[in-house]
UniProtKB/Swiss-Prot annotation:
Protein name: Inorganic pyrophosphatase
Organism of derivation: Mycobacterium tuberculosis (strain ATCC 25618 / H37Rv)
Keywords: Cytoplasm, Hydrolase, Magnesium, Metal-binding, Secreted
Residues at which Mg(2+) 1 binds: 52, 57, 89
UniProt lineage: Bacteria, Bacillati, Actinomycetota, Actinomycetes, Mycobacteriales
Record gene name: ppa
Superkingdom to which the source organism belongs: Bacteria
Pfam families according to UniProt: Pyrophosphatase (PF00719)
Reported function: Catalyzes the hydrolysis of inorganic pyrophosphate (PPi) forming two phosphate ions. Antigen that activates dendritic cells (DCs), increasing their expression of cell surface molecules and augmenting their production of TNF-alpha, IL-1beta, IL-6, IL-23 and IL-12p70. Rv3628 mediates these effects by binding to TLR2 and activating downstream MyD88-, MAPK- and NF-kappaB-dependent signaling pathways. Rv3628-stimulated DCs induce the expansion of OVA-specific CD4+ and CD8+ T cells which secrete IFN-gamma and IL-2, and the generation of effector/memory T cells. Thus, Rv3628 polarizes DCs toward a Th1 immune response and promotes protective immunity against M.tuberculosis infection.
Catalytic activity, reaction form: diphosphate + H2O = 2 phosphate + H(+)
Binding site for substrate: 16, 30, 42, 126
Matches recorded under InterPro entries: Pyrophosphatase, Pyrophosphatase_sf
Consequence of substituting residue 86 to A: Nearly no effect on catalytic activity with Mg(2+) as cofactor. 10-fold increase in catalytic activity with Zn(2+) as cofactor
Essential cofactor(s): Mg(2+)
Amino acid sequence: MQFDVTIEIPKGQRNKYEVDHETGRVRLDRYLYTPMAYPTDYGFIEDTLGDDGDPLDALVLLPQPVFPGVLVAARPVGMFRMVDEHGGDDKVLCVPAGDPRWDHVQDIGDVPAFELDAIKHFFVHYKDLEPGKFVKAADWVDRAEAEAEVQRSVERFKAGTH
Protein backbone atom coordinates (compact mmCIF):
# COMPACT_ATOMS: atom_id res chain seq x y z
CA MET A 1 0.00 0.00 0.00
CA GLN A 2 1.25 3.46 -0.91
CA PHE A 3 -0.35 6.92 -0.73
CA ASP A 4 0.42 10.63 -0.58
CA VAL A 5 0.77 12.37 2.77
CA THR A 6 0.38 16.15 2.86
CA ILE A 7 2.78 17.43 5.49
CA GLU A 8 1.32 20.10 7.76
CA ILE A 9 3.94 20.20 10.52
CA PRO A 10 7.67 19.54 10.06
CA LYS A 11 9.57 17.56 12.66
CA GLY A 12 10.93 19.80 15.43
CA GLN A 13 8.14 22.40 15.28
CA ARG A 14 6.03 23.71 18.16
CA ASN A 15 3.74 25.52 15.74
CA LYS A 16 0.62 23.51 14.89
CA TYR A 17 -0.25 24.16 11.27
CA GLU A 18 -3.33 22.82 9.51
CA VAL A 19 -4.31 22.86 5.86
CA ASP A 20 -7.57 24.76 5.39
CA HIS A 21 -9.46 22.25 3.23
CA GLU A 22 -11.66 24.98 1.72
CA THR A 23 -8.84 27.24 0.54
CA GLY A 24 -5.93 24.79 0.37
CA ARG A 25 -3.78 27.24 2.33
CA VAL A 26 -1.74 26.42 5.42
CA ARG A 27 -3.02 28.10 8.59
CA LEU A 28 -1.30 28.48 11.96
CA ASP A 29 -3.79 26.72 14.24
CA ARG A 30 -1.95 27.30 17.52
CA TYR A 31 1.35 27.04 19.36
CA LEU A 32 1.78 23.97 21.53
CA TYR A 33 1.24 24.85 25.18
CA THR A 34 3.83 22.30 26.30
CA PRO A 35 7.55 22.87 25.71
CA MET A 36 7.65 19.95 23.27
CA ALA A 37 8.23 19.64 19.53
CA TYR A 38 6.72 17.27 16.96
CA PRO A 39 8.90 14.11 16.83
CA THR A 40 8.20 13.38 13.13
CA ASP A 41 6.83 15.18 10.12
CA TYR A 42 3.06 15.22 10.62
CA GLY A 43 0.20 15.54 8.19
CA PHE A 44 -2.70 13.67 6.65
CA ILE A 45 -3.38 11.02 4.03
CA GLU A 46 -5.03 12.46 0.94
CA ASP A 47 -8.61 11.38 0.13
CA THR A 48 -9.36 9.82 3.52
CA LEU A 49 -11.77 10.57 6.35
CA GLY A 50 -10.86 9.54 9.88
CA ASP A 51 -13.19 8.78 12.78
CA ASP A 52 -12.84 12.40 13.93
CA GLY A 53 -14.26 13.78 10.66
CA ASP A 54 -10.87 15.01 9.43
CA PRO A 55 -8.52 13.33 6.97
CA LEU A 56 -6.61 10.44 8.57
CA ASP A 57 -3.47 11.69 10.35
CA ALA A 58 -0.04 10.43 9.33
CA LEU A 59 3.43 10.58 10.84
CA VAL A 60 6.31 10.25 8.37
CA LEU A 61 9.82 9.23 9.40
CA LEU A 62 12.09 11.29 7.16
CA PRO A 63 15.85 11.89 7.24
CA GLN A 64 15.22 15.65 7.19
CA PRO A 65 12.05 17.69 7.83
CA VAL A 66 10.14 19.04 4.83
CA PHE A 67 7.90 22.11 4.55
CA PRO A 68 4.16 22.46 5.24
CA GLY A 69 2.18 21.63 2.11
CA VAL A 70 4.71 19.17 0.68
CA LEU A 71 3.35 15.85 -0.63
CA VAL A 72 5.36 12.80 0.44
CA ALA A 73 4.82 9.40 -1.20
CA ALA A 74 4.63 7.10 1.81
CA ARG A 75 3.83 3.58 2.93
CA PRO A 76 2.45 2.53 6.33
CA VAL A 77 4.43 0.48 8.84
CA GLY A 78 2.08 0.76 11.83
CA MET A 79 -0.36 3.05 13.57
CA PHE A 80 -0.67 4.92 16.84
CA ARG A 81 -4.18 4.34 18.18
CA MET A 82 -5.16 7.36 20.20
CA VAL A 83 -8.30 8.72 21.87
CA ASP A 84 -8.53 12.41 22.74
CA GLU A 85 -11.25 14.84 23.78
CA HIS A 86 -12.93 14.40 20.36
CA GLY A 87 -12.77 10.58 20.25
CA GLY A 88 -10.61 8.40 18.01
CA ASP A 89 -7.59 10.23 16.58
CA ASP A 90 -5.39 7.54 15.01
CA LYS A 91 -2.05 8.38 13.43
CA VAL A 92 -0.58 6.14 10.71
CA LEU A 93 3.19 5.76 11.03
CA CYS A 94 4.84 5.86 7.60
CA VAL A 95 8.19 5.76 5.85
CA PRO A 96 9.03 7.19 2.42
CA ALA A 97 7.81 4.90 -0.36
CA GLY A 98 10.40 3.71 -2.86
CA ASP A 99 13.39 4.80 -0.74
CA PRO A 100 15.83 1.88 -0.30
CA ARG A 101 17.10 3.38 2.95
CA TRP A 102 13.79 2.34 4.50
CA ASP A 103 13.50 -1.16 2.96
CA HIS A 104 14.39 -2.73 6.32
CA VAL A 105 11.33 -1.08 7.94
CA GLN A 106 8.27 -3.07 6.89
CA ASP A 107 6.23 -3.28 10.11
CA ILE A 108 6.00 -1.62 13.52
CA GLY A 109 8.47 -4.10 15.05
CA ASP A 110 11.16 -2.85 12.66
CA VAL A 111 11.02 0.68 14.09
CA PRO A 112 13.42 1.13 17.03
CA ALA A 113 11.58 0.87 20.36
CA PHE A 114 13.13 4.13 21.56
CA GLU A 115 11.70 5.97 18.51
CA LEU A 116 8.24 4.53 19.18
CA ASP A 117 8.48 5.43 22.87
CA ALA A 118 9.50 9.02 22.04
CA ILE A 119 6.60 9.45 19.61
CA LYS A 120 4.15 7.94 22.11
CA HIS A 121 5.46 10.18 24.90
CA PHE A 122 4.92 13.25 22.75
CA PHE A 123 1.33 12.42 21.81
CA VAL A 124 0.37 11.32 25.32
CA HIS A 125 1.62 14.62 26.80
CA TYR A 126 1.51 17.34 24.12
CA LYS A 127 -1.95 18.54 25.23
CA ASP A 128 -1.24 18.42 28.99
CA LEU A 129 -1.33 22.20 29.53
CA GLU A 130 -4.23 23.00 27.17
CA PRO A 131 -7.52 23.64 28.99
CA GLY A 132 -10.20 21.09 28.11
CA LYS A 133 -7.89 18.88 26.05
CA PHE A 134 -6.57 15.43 26.89
CA VAL A 135 -5.31 12.11 25.57
CA LYS A 136 -6.62 9.08 27.43
CA ALA A 137 -5.69 5.96 25.46
CA ALA A 138 -2.75 5.37 23.18
CA ASP A 139 -0.80 2.41 21.85
CA TRP A 140 0.92 1.04 18.75
CA VAL A 141 -0.61 -1.46 16.32
CA ASP A 142 0.94 -3.26 13.35
CA ARG A 143 0.98 -2.54 9.63
CA ALA A 144 -2.00 -4.81 8.86
CA GLU A 145 -4.20 -2.84 11.25
CA ALA A 146 -2.86 0.45 9.86
CA GLU A 147 -3.63 -0.61 6.28
CA ALA A 148 -7.13 -1.70 7.31
CA GLU A 149 -7.78 1.72 8.90
CA VAL A 150 -6.47 3.52 5.82
CA GLN A 151 -8.84 1.45 3.66
CA ARG A 152 -11.80 2.20 5.97
CA SER A 153 -10.90 5.91 5.85
CA VAL A 154 -10.77 5.86 2.04
CA GLU A 155 -14.21 4.22 1.99
CA ARG A 156 -15.60 6.83 4.44
CA PHE A 157 -14.20 9.59 2.22
CA LYS A 158 -15.81 8.09 -0.90
CA ALA A 159 -19.13 7.68 0.92
CA GLY A 160 -18.93 11.20 2.36
CA THR A 161 -19.67 9.94 5.88
CA HIS A 162 -17.75 9.15 9.06
